[in-house]
């Protein structure tokens, strides 16, 4: 989260130029993200589910009331997903700071956050090395690149770091903080006593509030702490906050946000911000070359995550731009050569609360590091913040696919509704949930929306087609508020047609600048849409509830269509590449829900027209 320097960027550039035949991670694909679109015009990873775990609120006394929430970490332990994240009241590096913890059995329904590490008082009179500011009634700011450690005996620990910020342009990760703390997580979500794991210079048992881990009577806990401290791959993730001459850290350089995975031959691949990379043949003790920018990768001052997936391949997840959108992934068969670039999350929620250094977009991605659990479903799970404000996770099905071979025949009243749901791509905020619900004696894919600043979204990918028939059956639970937009898009997310269930009971279609009425709908009564599109002619025929077909012109030409989009709101185009960063204002009404809307999707069928 340190803003970096011109010197570092110059070093990265020089190293990149020098990199020629080095055996290293590289991106060989030709696809690039287009920053003018939140989704980057990227092909979607089929079945990616994006789920909000925490929505920040300014009012109230509960833990989500702090509106800077960032840098989440993830683990899987005892059949639960665990996420920790750091939090400040308003902005980045503005004290006080704390770390919070959430958990979930299924990755979709999450516990309320609880404080793992509370605000910590800096000793009065403390003067930070290199600065003249003196601490008076001051509190620490938390900053950590590693959030969990699972011991050899199977115990889970949450970690954090108390850094010091005493004035403008000060940073908590400059090596002049207080120290790293550790705490056991219990299977029921409770936590043990807080201990210091490692002090920074000038701090020790004489001037800190928590005991040093050596003082614990739990020998297995002490063993777990010492195992962490002796593991170079764990310690590499502490370099930013640690003493600059800490002998336990193998590579004491200003590289940020380390992640790693092992190749089939046992070598460790390291990844850092700016898509820097290096290799280690001895488990991280030494590195074969100073980190260099991975050829072909595009990544700025945001994290890049890499891991082995359950099918034996490898994946990196990152923002492939100089901005923090979209969130995308690349896949490799050998862990070195990455060949594609697929969309994970192409939405940007409205930033409801201003604050220092708050960047737009889904960012600071982190997965489950080796040793911290393997999800039972075999899928890839990552966590990240949205706008440094809300906390999200994504479930990415493994094997990772960018297309489907068979046309869709999804009937959600059937017994395999959950299997069908896994083939949809969803964007599911806490106040706009997307999921399979039981409605009466049947089940449906349900989109809800009670958030004035967000929307629910569900996409279904089908085989790329120049001509396609789509049969969609759904029910709206209201006609006097809310709206649902239905689009057919090409593989890059570009819509060619849009139907709208508006807030007055009308069904509209977008015709250039204007919307044209094509029918009406009734609360609680199913709507059956039968649509046949010819992309070459740009016309589509539309029949509603078996009525007479109407001929309609697409509002944007595309060569093919391969995605149905259902969205409880309009397309978002803010922010863009020219939007100033560091938003310093709040959006009015961000605390309030509006009257919920609900849309029930009963079935979807696509086919080649006769």
Spans of model-derived segments:
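Beta-rich carbohydrate-recognition and catalytic domains
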Residues: 22-67, 76-141, 150-302, 308-358, ...
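Beta-strand-rich interaction surfaces with strong enrichment in secreted/lumenal proteins
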Residues: 61, 135-136, 354-355, 456-462, ...
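Extracellular/lumenal carbohydrate-interaction signature centered on repeated Trp-anchored short motifs
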Residues: 64, 459-470, 518-525, 595-600
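Extracellular glycan-recognition surfaces and repeat-rich motifs
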Residues: 416-444
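Secretory/extracellular carbohydrate-interaction modules
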Residues: 439-507
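Short tryptophan-centered beta-strand motifs in secreted/extracellular beta-sheet-rich domains
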Residues: 470-472, 524-534, 540-542
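Short, aromatic/His-centered strand-loop micro-motif at the edge of beta-sheets
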Residues: 507-530
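Flexible glycan-contacting loops in extracellular carbohydrate-active proteins
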Residues: 552-599
């Amino acid at each position: 989260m340190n803003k970096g320097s011109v010197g570092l960027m110059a070093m990265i550039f020089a190293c990149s130029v020098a990199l020629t035949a080095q055996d290293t991670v590289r991106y060989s694909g030709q696809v690039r993200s287009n920053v003018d679109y939140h989704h980057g015009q990227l092909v979607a990873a089929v079945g990616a589910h994006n789920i909000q775990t925490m929505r920040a609120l300014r009012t109230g006394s509960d833990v989500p009331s702090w509106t800077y929430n960032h840098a989440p970490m993830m683990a899987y332990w005892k059949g639960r997903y665990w996420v920790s994240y750091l939090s400040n009241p308003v902005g980045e590096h503005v004290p006080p700071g704390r770390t919070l913890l959430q958990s979930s059995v299924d990755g979709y329904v999450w516990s309320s956050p609880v404080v793992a590490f509370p605000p910590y008082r800096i000793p009065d009179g403390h003067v930070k090395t290199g600065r003249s500011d003196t601490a008076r009634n001051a509190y620490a700011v938390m900053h950590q690149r590693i959030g969990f450690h699972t011991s050899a005996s199977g115990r889970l620990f949450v970690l954090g770091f108390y850094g010091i910020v005493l004035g403008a342009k000060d940073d908590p990760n400059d090596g002049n903080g207080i120290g790293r703390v550790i705490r056991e997580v219990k299977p029921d979500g409770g936590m043990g006593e807080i201990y210091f794991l490692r002090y920074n210079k000038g701090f020790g048992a004489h001037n800190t509030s928590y005991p040093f881990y050596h003082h614990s009577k739990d020998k297995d806990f002490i063993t777990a702490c010492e195992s962490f401290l002796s593991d170079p791959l764990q310690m590499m993730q502490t370099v930013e906050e640690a003493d600059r001459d800490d002998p336990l850290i193998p590579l004491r350089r200003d590289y940020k946000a380390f992640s790693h995975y092992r190749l089939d031959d046992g070598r460790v691949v390291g990844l850092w911000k700016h898509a820097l990379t290096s290799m280690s043949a001895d488990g991280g003790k030494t590195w074969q070359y100073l980190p260099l920018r991975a050829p072909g990768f595009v990544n700025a001052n945001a994290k890049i995550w890499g891991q082995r997936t359950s099918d034996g391949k490898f994946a990196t997840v990152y923002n492939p731009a100089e901005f923090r959108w979209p969130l995308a992934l690349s896949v490799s068969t050998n862990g070195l050569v990455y060949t594609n670039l697929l969309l994970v999350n192409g939405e940007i929620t409205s930033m409801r609360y201003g604050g220092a250094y708050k960047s737009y977009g889904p960012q600071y991605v982190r997965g489950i590091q080796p040793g911290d659990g393997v999800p039972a479903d075999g899928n890839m799970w990552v966590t990240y913040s949205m706008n440094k404000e809300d906390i999200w996770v994504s479930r990415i099905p493994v094997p990772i696919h960018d297309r489907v071979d068979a046309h869709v025949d999804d009937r959600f009243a059937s017994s395999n509704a959950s299997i069908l749901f896994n083939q949809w791509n969803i964007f599911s905020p806490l106040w706009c949930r997307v999921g399979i619900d039981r409605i009466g004696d049947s089940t449906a894919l349900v989109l809800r929306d009670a958030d004035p600043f967000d929307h629910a979204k569900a996409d279904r990918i089908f085989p790329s087609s120049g001509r396609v028939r789509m049969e969609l059956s759904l029910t709206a639970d209201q006609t006097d508020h809310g709206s649902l937009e239905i689009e057919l898009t090409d593989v890059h997310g570009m819509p060619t047609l849009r139907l709208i269930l508006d807030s007055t009971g009308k069904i509209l279609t977008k015709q250039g600048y204007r919307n044209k009425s094509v029918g009406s709908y009734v609360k609680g009564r199913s709507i059956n849409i039968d649509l046949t599109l010819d992309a070459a002619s740009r016309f589509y025929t539309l029949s509603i509830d078996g009525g007479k077909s109407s001929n309609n012109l697409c509002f944007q030409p595309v060569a093919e269509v391969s995605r149905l989009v259902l969205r409880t709101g309009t397309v978002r185009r803010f922010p863009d590449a020219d939007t100033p960063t560091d938003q310093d204002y709040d959006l009015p009404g961000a605390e309030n829900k509006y009257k919920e809307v609900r849309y029930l999707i009963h079935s979807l069928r696509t086919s080649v027209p006769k």
